[in-house]
């Protein structure tokens, strides 16, 4: 079975073709700058994995007016006869779609139908930057692949098991009943994937695993997992809540927004832009790439050093709070770009946790690997793992399960 994975955003389409017989990636690519009329840089690429160590990448510059043109460009690359990843597009057996927000009703992967489209549409106010692009991608993909099932996999689904005392805000209750304002979370596909992978490494049924999963990238989130199911997560109604991120503030005093409006004359739109695009690490030190921040800190930039301190202190606070929520923890899992590759952030995030059962092995923590590896000592009561996430494979597995059900 070959499955095409599509992550359709507002101005881009990420795609990956996976052969589920051995879960190998046949091709992966990106179409970006959709809707721009003055494209001068290469905005379409596809990397082919022909079953050997050699990869071949094609990059082109092409104006892409809309998602239909973008999808056609991706399909044209995938069907390139010279690359030999498949003989014909009819070899694609199913299409899996990543959906950021499914609201309260979409709690598991489902085959796309009118009801699913309606629910994704209804969740647009909760994910205005993402869900419209997802809908465009689904519509175009269904037109181009008419004979195969299309399956939606929701980032919010993993968090539907979070109990009311953890997902309801202390606001007038009618804001929840009438407007569905509650904690939804994000990165659920990633958190679920590393949860299942960690269970294998611990050699325990996932239903017996209590974990703290730490997804650190330009967007970052954490989850408390009890018996393989999420009982809390750091992101909220939107991906703005929680950890300090690349350009997002994470947790702040809500009254700051009223202060900015009343005293600085900032509009709601300006405040929203600032909190999402100009805050976080970038707001503190002017940079949001951890490599640049570490280099600046090493060169004596005090604000860069402060940014890392604020970031990792927030992570450590969440680890402590999730330990209290879970009672007993089997492992802490770091994943995503920063979580997998930044030993400094990992080490600082685990400082002062020895008395709580977390003992870091500095030598193990300093290594790099594309495979999962443990970074805690044998004496550590709580194991600490670095597990590379693979959201596309997770979506492919979910899609296969739905199609074969």
Swiss-Prot record:
Binding site for Mg(2+): 7, 391
GO molecular function, one term: acetate kinase activity
Species assigned in the record: Desulfotalea psychrophila (strain LSv54 / DSM 12343)
Pathway the protein acts in: Metabolic intermediate biosynthesis; acetyl-CoA biosynthesis; acetyl-CoA from acetate: step 1/2
Catalytic activity: acetate + ATP = acetyl phosphate + ADP
Annotated Pfam families: Acetate_kinase
Protein purpose: Catalyzes the formation of acetyl phosphate from acetate and ATP. Can also catalyze the reverse reaction.
Cofactor (UniProt): Mg(2+); Mn(2+)
Name assigned to this protein: Acetate kinase
NCBIfam families named in the record: ackA
UniProt key word Membrane: no
Oligomer and partners: Homodimer.
Cofactor, how bound (note): Mg(2+). Can also accept Mn(2+).
Domain of life where this protein originates: Bacteria
């Amino acid at each position: 079975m070959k499955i095409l994975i599509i992550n359709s955003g507002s101005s881009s389409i990420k795609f990956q073709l996976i052969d589920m017989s051995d879960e190998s990636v046949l091709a992966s690519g990106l179409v970006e700058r959709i809707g721009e009329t003055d494209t001068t840089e290469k905005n379409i690429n596809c990397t082919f994995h022909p079953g050997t160590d050699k990869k071949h990448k094609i990059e082109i510059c092409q104006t892409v007016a809309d998602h239909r043109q973008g999808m056609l460009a991706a399909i044209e690359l995938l069907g390139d006869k010279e690359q030999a990843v498949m003989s014909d597009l009819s070899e694609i057996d199913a299409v899996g779609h990543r959906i950021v927000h499914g609201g309260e009703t979409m709690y598991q992967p489902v085959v796309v139908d009118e009801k699913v489209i309606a629910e994704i549409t209804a969740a647009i106010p909760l994910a205005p930057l993402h869900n419209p692009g997802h809908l465009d991608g689904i519509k175009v993909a269904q037109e181009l692949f008419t004979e195969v099932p299309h399956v939606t996999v929701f980032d919010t689904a993993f968090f539907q098991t979070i109990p009311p005392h953890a997902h309801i805000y202390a606001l007038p209750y009618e804001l929840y009943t009438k407007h569905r304002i509650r904690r939804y979370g994000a990165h659920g596909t990633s958190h679920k994937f590393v949860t299942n992978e960690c269970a294998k490494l611990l050699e325990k049924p996932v239903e017996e695993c209590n974990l703290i999963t730490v997804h650190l990238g330009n967007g970052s989130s954490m989850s408390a997992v009890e018996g393989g199911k999420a009982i809390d997560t750091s992101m909220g109604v939107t991906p703005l809540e929680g950890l300090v991120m690349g350009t997002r503030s994470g947790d702040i005093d809500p009254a700051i927004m009223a202060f900015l409006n009343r005293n600085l004359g900032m509009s709601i739109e300006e405040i929203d832009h600032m909190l999402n695009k100009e805050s976080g690490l970038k707001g503190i030190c002017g940079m949001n790439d951890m490599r640049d921040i570490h280099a600046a800190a090493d060169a004596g930039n005090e604000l860069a050093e402060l940014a890392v301190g604020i970031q990792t202190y927030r992570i450590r606070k969440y680890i402590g709070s999730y330990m209290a929520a879970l009672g007993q923890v089997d492992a802490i899992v770091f994943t995503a770009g920063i979580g997998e590759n930044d030993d400094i952030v990992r080490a600082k995030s685990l400082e002062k946790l020895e008395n709580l059962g977390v003992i870091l092995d500095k030598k193990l923590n300093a290594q790099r690997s594309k495979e999962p590896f443990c970074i805690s000592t044998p004496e550590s009561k709580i194991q600490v793992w670095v597990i590379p996430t693979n959201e596309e494979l997770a979506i492919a597995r979910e899609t296969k399960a739905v199609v074969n059900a």
